[in-house]
Amino acid sequence: CIRDRIVSALERFAPLPLQDGFDNAGLQVGLTEAEATGALLCLDVTEAVVDEAVMLGYNLIISHHPLIFKGYKSIIGRDYIERCVLKAIKNDIVIYSAHTNLDNAPGGVNYKIAEKIGLKNVRILDPKEEYLLKFVTFVPDAQADRVRKALFEAGCGCIGNYDSCSYNLEGEGTFRAQRGTSPFCGEIGELHKESEVRIETILPAFKKAAVIKALLATHPYEEPAFDFYPLKNTWTQVGSGVVGELEEPEAELDFLKRIKKTFEVGCLRHTRLSGRLIQKVALCGGAGAFLLPKAVSADADVFITGEVKYHDYFNYENDILVAEMGHYESEQYTKEIFYTIIR
């Protein structure tokens, strides 16, 4: 069905907890128990898009921008959003959106833009902070491997391009089982000492529930001891914008002309040219001007985004070349990400 095969694939790639606080990514309209008859992939849901899905007999629309942002007290067709909702419901069409969760995800929107430009050594420009937890538990020696494996499968232990990361320390645990318990080892009413392994690992905060479930399913104790510690570490694989390098430096004007052609931009606005060579490129699809200070701090030669406010040009014109290609133009290739995920 749509939920098990398509929505789950989208959310594995771009988990909903990665979306920004203002966002409304995820299921917008419809029931996901049906089998998909076809999927229409788009940047924005419009009436024309819903009409096309109806004409083609498709029952799924996947968009980058959410159709619904604000709350509605009634849906009676007052604007295009309400009309899209009504038409989708009438024709049993599911609408699903992956927005800032896809922007922030590894391999997401900004990575696709970087791919089109030809950047190498691409990394997150503004990594997320306070998204990670340290997890610690204590397991009898003989069961440590099984528990550790379950924790990794639940989402623990990923650091950069490494997985199954943990630190393990042998020690001794003590406990006294009370009346009414069924201890795995030791006797009721007697103090027991057990050789145990302290397992330390790391996880995204949104996987906490899955990790607890995995621990309780595999740990031999009735009451396993475990702790979560909030971390201040940045999560370098997740965040806003990216920065990378061109294979060879390019003249400013040549680079801008190539961007204009690659993204089919009618009018590419930019700050004045200074004659610098372009090699380090920072970018953010959509309205990304908030990342200009990060781009400057990264020593990028140019910052490319979809929307820039008037005064942002003046604030940074002496520090970096700023280029604005248009919101749609910057994110148009998001459809290719959707296609790769669900095909």
Can you name each region flagged by the protein language model?
Residues R3-R343:
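Active-site catalytic microenvironments in core metabolic enzymes, especially phosphate/sugar-handling
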